[in-house]
Amino acid sequence: MIGKLKGLIDSYAEDFVILDVGGVGYQVHCSARTLQALPSPGEAATLSIETYVREDQIKLFGFRSDVEREWFRLLQTVQGVGAKVALAVLGTLPPADLANAIALRDKAAVARTPGVGPKVAERIVTELKDKAPAFADVDPGVIRLSGAIEDSRAPQPIADAISALINLGYGQPQAAAAIAAASRAAGDKAETAQLIRLGLKELAK
């Protein structure tokens, strides 16, 4: 099985890249986000690989990190999610945002993925909530906020600040992560306006 490829970018197509490794061109399917991040043809690149072997074909899927590859595998444990949908999800949400969306059960963030409807998005955030392994880069503050929001225990300034950032167009995972960081910086007695201001600074980094 192929676990990693390191070579030169030969060419791109809509959903895959040809990676030249020692004169052999490997067709590697990638998410849109990964393809956009890869260098120009002729430059070097390294991809973590997931190899699918079937009776009639061998298919390679490429990722910028082992963490992204693990998410690709985990997503496919959800009913109705195959390789194509898993790649699409990772093309819409980078691993950290996906982890936060699952922690917050933010199915709307997942449903922004082309080809993912509300039912599949609901299954992803529900079935993976307790499966997200140690590699998931979830902000601890987001995890605490998730429980507080679900139980209606979140302090009103924090809840209002998250709502304000969402109204400004930010996704719930982004807003929650930013306000979690703002709350750590400002302390427990911070007011809504201060949290919003600090949250916007976090989002601008």
From Swiss-Prot:
<dbReference type="InterPro" id="IPR000085">
    <property type="entry name" value="RuvA"/>
</dbReference>
<dbReference type="InterPro" id="IPR010994">
    <property type="entry name" value="RuvA_2-like"/>
</dbReference>
<dbReference type="GO" id="GO:0005524">
    <property type="term" value="F:ATP binding"/>
</dbReference>
<keyword id="KW-0234">DNA repair</keyword>
<keyword id="KW-0233">DNA recombination</keyword>
<dbReference type="GO" id="GO:0006310">
    <property type="term" value="P:DNA recombination"/>
</dbReference>
<comment type="function">
    <text>The RuvA-RuvB-RuvC complex processes Holliday junction (HJ) DNA during genetic recombination and DNA repair, while the RuvA-RuvB complex plays an important role in the rescue of blocked DNA replication forks via replication fork reversal (RFR). RuvA specifically binds to HJ cruciform DNA, conferring on it an open structure. The RuvB hexamer acts as an ATP-dependent pump, pulling dsDNA into and through the RuvAB complex. HJ branch migration allows RuvC to scan DNA until it finds its consensus sequence, where it cleaves and resolves the cruciform DNA.</text>
</comment>
<dbReference type="GO" id="GO:0009379">
    <property type="term" value="C:Holliday junction helicase complex"/>
</dbReference>
<feature type="region of interest" description="Domain II">
    <location>
        <begin position="65"/>
        <end position="143"/>
    </location>
</feature>
<dbReference type="InterPro" id="IPR003583">
    <property type="entry name" value="Hlx-hairpin-Hlx_DNA-bd_motif"/>
</dbReference>
<dbReference type="GO" id="GO:0000400">
    <property type="term" value="F:four-way junction DNA binding"/>
</dbReference>
<dbReference type="InterPro" id="IPR012340">
    <property type="entry name" value="NA-bd_OB-fold"/>
</dbReference>
<feature type="region of interest" description="Domain I">
    <location>
        <begin position="1"/>
        <end position="64"/>
    </location>
</feature>
<keyword id="KW-0227">DNA damage</keyword>
<dbReference type="Pfam" id="PF07499">
    <property type="entry name" value="RuvA_C"/>
</dbReference>
<dbReference type="Pfam" id="PF14520">
    <property type="entry name" value="HHH_5"/>
</dbReference>
<dbReference type="Pfam" id="PF01330">
    <property type="entry name" value="RuvA_N"/>
</dbReference>
<dbReference type="GO" id="GO:0009378">
    <property type="term" value="F:four-way junction helicase activity"/>
</dbReference>
<keyword id="KW-0238">DNA-binding</keyword>
<comment type="similarity">
    <text>Belongs to the RuvA family.</text>
</comment>
<feature type="region of interest" description="Domain III">
    <location>
        <begin position="154"/>
        <end position="205"/>
    </location>
</feature>
<dbReference type="InterPro" id="IPR011114">
    <property type="entry name" value="RuvA_C"/>
</dbReference>
<dbReference type="GO" id="GO:0048476">
    <property type="term" value="C:Holliday junction resolvase complex"/>
</dbReference>
<dbReference type="InterPro" id="IPR013849">
    <property type="entry name" value="DNA_helicase_Holl-junc_RuvA_I"/>
</dbReference>
<dbReference type="GO" id="GO:0005737">
    <property type="term" value="C:cytoplasm"/>
</dbReference>
<dbReference type="InterPro" id="IPR036267">
    <property type="entry name" value="RuvA_C_sf"/>
</dbReference>
<feature type="region of interest" description="Flexible linker">
    <location>
        <begin position="144"/>
        <end position="154"/>
    </location>
</feature>
<keyword id="KW-0963">Cytoplasm</keyword>
<protein>
    <recommendedName>
        <fullName>Holliday junction branch migration complex subunit RuvA</fullName>
    </recommendedName>
</protein>
<dbReference type="GO" id="GO:0006281">
    <property type="term" value="P:DNA repair"/>
</dbReference>
<comment type="subunit">
    <text>Homotetramer. Forms an RuvA(8)-RuvB(12)-Holliday junction (HJ) complex. HJ DNA is sandwiched between 2 RuvA tetramers; dsDNA enters through RuvA and exits via RuvB. An RuvB hexamer assembles on each DNA strand where it exits the tetramer. Each RuvB hexamer is contacted by two RuvA subunits (via domain III) on 2 adjacent RuvB subunits; this complex drives branch migration. In the full resolvosome a probable DNA-RuvA(4)-RuvB(12)-RuvC(2) complex forms which resolves the HJ.</text>
</comment>
